[in-house]
């Protein structure tokens, strides 16, 4: 499972109170393989999980190495994610928890979650 965004909000490396960290912990308990990307918070995350998860330097790599992906932090670069990129996921399932993307492509499974 690929996670895009680890910090509690964009433009910071702060992972304290980050939902992403709690989700990683839960996924690891369920024996899931987790792969992550974040422009700034990778090193702070690595201090917690060490080699228990995989780390990507480029967010695009998440799509080639994951069954599904979840957007957790609304980083500016993630707004460039295309349905073509999502189709590289084995399940073609992409979950946007921040409602920053919109797709009309019937060949992918796109779920947009959020409050309101």
Task: Specify the residue positions occupied by each region the protein language model found.
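Structural/interface elements that position substrates and couple domains in central-metabolism enzymes
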Residues: 1-116
């Amino acid at each position: 499972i690929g996670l895009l965004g680890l910090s509690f909000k964009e433009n910071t490396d702060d992972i304290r109170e980050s939902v992403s960290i709690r989700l990683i912990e839960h996924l690891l308990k369920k024996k899931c393989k987790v792969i992550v990307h974040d422009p700034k918070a990778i090193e702070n995350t690595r201090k917690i999980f060490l080699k228990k998860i995989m780390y990507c330097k480029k967010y695009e790599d998440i799509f080639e190495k994951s069954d599904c992906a979840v957007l957790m932090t609304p980083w500016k670069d993630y707004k460039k994610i295309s349905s073509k990129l999502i189709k590289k996921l084995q399940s073609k399932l992409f979950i946007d928890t921040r409602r920053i993307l919109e797709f009309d492509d019937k060949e992918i499974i796109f779920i947009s979650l959020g409050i309101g």
